[in-house]
Swiss-Prot record:
It is a multi-pass membrane protein. The chain crosses the membrane at residues 8-28, 43-63, 95-115, 137-157, 167-187, 227-247, 268-288, 314-334, 367-387, 424-444, 460-480, 482-502, 516-536. GO terms for molecular function: L-amino acid transmembrane transporter activity. Keywords: Cell membrane, Membrane, Transmembrane, Transmembrane helix. This is Uncharacterized protein MPN_308. To M.pneumoniae MPN_095 and MPN_096. Coiled coil: none annotated. It is found in: Cell membrane. One of its GO terms (cellular component) is plasma membrane.
Length: 565
């Protein structure tokens, strides 16, 4: 039988890179980057450039790393090959028990948030569209569960449907990416935007029109990123970590080399694809930044531009619906992969119930993987929605318009959206931390040569070091920030905070809970990722005498299942 030739051309590969790395993430992170850059347009652009260089460097480094294994495990596989066993199991636990279900927790919520904005514009409402009940969160939960169930069943089991959905979404999601920069520059250029609130350079923080002192900022309860000097520096690296979220998914393309007609051109396809994505992001980031950082802030500005408030609302609504469709594209892409990586882990004996499903696994129709994903995702989705809507106190002011506070006294949707942001923050950070671990392990392997690299790349080491250094500093700064901010609350003065913040005043207990929760979730993620490794090892040592004996038992069982299958 003739061996099938790889079919992906250079242009097609470049388009795959662009399609997998560009998406709706920028609309959710642009304002965060501007805020952490202390409203400095120059610093915000610089942060986007540094993050983009780091992402391109990661992609180039991953070409060599991905060439070692050909499976559906992606990051998990790379960590397994180039790092220690405990780190592999930590990565596996994170991707299975946290990344997978939490993606189906907060991504449907981001879609719902976008359609609330969309219908707000289309219907001419003053606040986000809601059902005007005290249990709106339950109604939205029902929709979120339908989204998760659909995307975790139809696309994985009927790949053709998933591919068609990808094409449709790709066509739709590029419309906002082109339209928003154009309208953003026009709005700002005609004096209808928020350009006056954005400065070229970092400005010293102001309190009542005067430059604030360190003591005043501490007393008012500000976080470290609002401080002059060190605040801007830390804010830059936190911004870079946030920007990584906008590129999430680019690493899937690192395995393209084996599918290309001309494998030697893979680096150029990755480089040019990510470069085009970066240009899109930079232009869009500038357009959003000069209008306050959020597209939602442009609704009134577009009304002024068109000299028709209703026209501005309708355009705002249509674009937000398209952004929501872009979010569904992210869900669709992840849903195509998730059941397959779960089945690969089951096939290796690395997930619970692996013995019971041997002989039933099928990468083309991953029914077992689908069931596994549904049980995990739907359980977490319901549990975390209840916690977020009813028990999470700290709130993000931007979400106050997504619930009728006169009917829903708990502000449940504001709480829920704020809680989903908290989950998304650490989920993205852990993902890129594990990528950095895999790349660093590959750097070490260049010296030890424990893993044979068939085709070493000359550009690997410089790209790998850039990726690791930028990634590690960003992760480290993002981790220590909530600890510093919590410590700063010892200097909080309620009287000063009231005077400085006015209507934006936040109670001390809410500040404490918000900053403590960031740390609690970080610790929770670490425990869920790494504690099971220790517990399982102790159990297997006790039952089988040693880990080596257990691994031998697994291999014998898998071999027996293969023979019988």
């Amino acid at each position: 039988m003739k061996q099938q030739k790889p079919k992906i051309s250079f242009i097609a590969a470049m388009l795959i890179v662009i399609g997998s790395s560009i998406g709706a993430g920028i609309f959710f992170k642009s304002s965060t980057v501007l805020e952490n850059s202390q409203a400095s347009l120059v610093l915000a652009i610089f942060n986007w450039l540094v993050a983009s260089v780091a992402v391109i460097a990661m992609a180039l480094a991953l070409i060599e790393i991905a060439s070692v294994r050909n499976d559906n495990l992606s990051i998990i596989s790379w960590v397994k090959v180039f790092n220690r066993r405990w780190l592999y199991h930590g990565c596996k636990n994170f991707m299975t028990y946290l990344y997978l279900p939490l993606t189906f927790f907060f991504m449907p919520l981001y879609f719902i948030c976008s359609i609330q904005d969309g219908f707000r514009g289309l219907l001419g409402l003053e606040t986000g569209a809601h059902f005007n009940t005290s249990v709106d969160w339950l109604i939205w939960l029902a929709l979120a569960l339908i989204i998760t169930t659909y995307f975790l069943t139809i696309p994985p089991l009927y790949a053709k449907v998933g591919n068609i959905q990808n094409m449709v979404v790709s066509a739709v999601k590029f419309i906002p990416l082109v339209f928003v920069p154009i309208i953003g520059f026009i709005v700002a250029g005609t004096g209808n935007g928020e350009l006056k609130n954005v400065k070229a350079l970092v400005q010293p923080p102001q309190i009542n029109g005067a430059t604030a002192s360190f003591t005043q900022l501490v007393q008012a309860g500000y976080g470290i990123t609002r401080f002059t000097g060190i605040g801007a520096g830390m804010g830059s690296f936190i911004s870079i970590a946030a920007i990584f979220f906008a590129y999430d998914g680019f690493y899937v393309t690192a395995g393209l080399q084996s599918e290309m007609r001309e494998p030697k051109k893979t680096p150029w396809a990755l480089f040019l694809g990510l470069l085009i994505t970066t240009l899109f992001y930079l232009i869009l980031a500038v357009a959003l930044s000069i209008n306050g950082g959020l597209f939602s802030g442009m609704e009134e500005s577009m009304g002024k531009l068109f000299n028709n408030k209703r026209a501005g609302q309708i355009v705002f609504g249509v674009v937000n619906l398209m952004i929501g469709i872009g979010v569904l594209g992210i869900i669709n892409g992840f849903a195509l992969w998730a059941p397959r990586f779960v089945e690969d882990l089951l096939a290796q004996g690395d997930l619970p119930f692996w013995k019971q499903v041997q002989g039933r696994l099928n990468p083309n129709k991953p029914v077992v993987g689908v069931i596994y994903c549904l049980v995990l995702s739907l359980t977490v989705q319901v549990l975390f929605t209840v916690i977020g809507a009813l028990a999470y106190l700290p709130t993000v002011a931007d979400y106050k318009n997504y619930v009728n506070t006169e009917i829903d006294k708990l502000n449940s949707m504001q709480w829920l959206y704020s809680f989903s942001d908290l989950m998304a923050t650490w989920t993205s950070l852990f993902t890129f931390a594990f990528i950095a671990c895999a790349i660093f392990g590959a750097i070490v392997n260049r010296k030890t040569k424990k893993i044979t690299i068939a085709n070493p790349k000359r550009y690997f080491l410089p790209a790998a070091w850039i990726a690791v250094v930028v990634n590690c500093i960003s992760v480290f700064v993002t981790i220590i920030e909530p600890f510093i901010n919590l410590f700063l609350l010892f200097g909080y003065d309620e009287t000063v905070a009231h005077t400085v913040l006015g209507n934006d005043f936040i109670e001390l207990n809410e500040l404490v809970i918000g900053r403590v929760m960031l740390i609690v979730v970080l610790v929770f993620f670490a425990i869920i990722s790494f504690l099971p490794v220790y517990v399982e090892d102790q159990y297997h040592k006790r039952k089988f005498g040693s880990l080596a004996n257990y691994q031998q038992y697994v291999q014998q069982h898998l071999a027996h299942s293969t023979i019988n299958g």
